A protein has these predicted regions:
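Structural preference for alpha-helix termini/caps and helix-kink/transition segments
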Residues: 1-161
Length: 161
């Protein structure tokens, strides 16, 4: 049971990281609004809290807690309209913290060539409003171990853990 909990926690971190990377791909430079400025303060606090926890006799439980607080705060604050700077700050902090534990090392990408071809074929089917073919291709992508999410910015594809 504890292994399943650990796997679910790691999956949550990968999902968040991959989502932030997707947002960053489509983000534009812009001024930080009130929401983003508040998030930047939370990023700073998470980094400081993480460092304090690790300095406290390697209190890994508290340090991991700071990572999850950051993810929670970022999930509330970030969306498709967030400026690059805010998204990049979250990714940088999350990557730095995760690096201490040697996690989040799996590359975030759209997968192998077969999966990329299926994704392109599905995008074409959707453009042609061929919903049956689109659904069939989605099922095939899912069967290969990927999670596909349709967003305003396009298809977001992540490897299932």
């Amino acid at each position: 049971e504890m292994i399943e909990q650990a796997k679910a926690s790691l999956d949550r971190l990968y999902t968040a990281r991959d989502h932030y990377l997707f947002l960053l791909q489509n983000a534009k430079d812009g001024e930080l609004g009130e929401k983003e400025l508040a998030l930047m303060e939370k990023v700073k606090a998470a980094r400081e809290g993480f460092d304090e926890a690790m300095d406290d006799d390697l209190n890994t439980a508290d340090a991991m807690g700071k990572m999850f607080e950051l993810v929670r705060d970022a999930n509330v604050a970030l969306d498709e309209n967030s400026p690059k700077q805010a998204i990049a700050a979250v990714l940088d902090a999350l990557g730095e913290m995760a690096g201490v534990f040697g996690i989040l090392t799996r590359k975030a990408d759209d997968g192998d060539e077969k999966v990329k071809a299926l994704i392109e074929a599905r995008a074409k089917a959707r453009a042609e409003k061929n919903w049956a073919e689109s659904d069939r291709l989605r099922d095939e992508i899912t069967a290969l171990g990927y999670v596909l999410k349709d967003t305003k910015q396009g298809q977001q594809v992540t490897k299932a853990i």
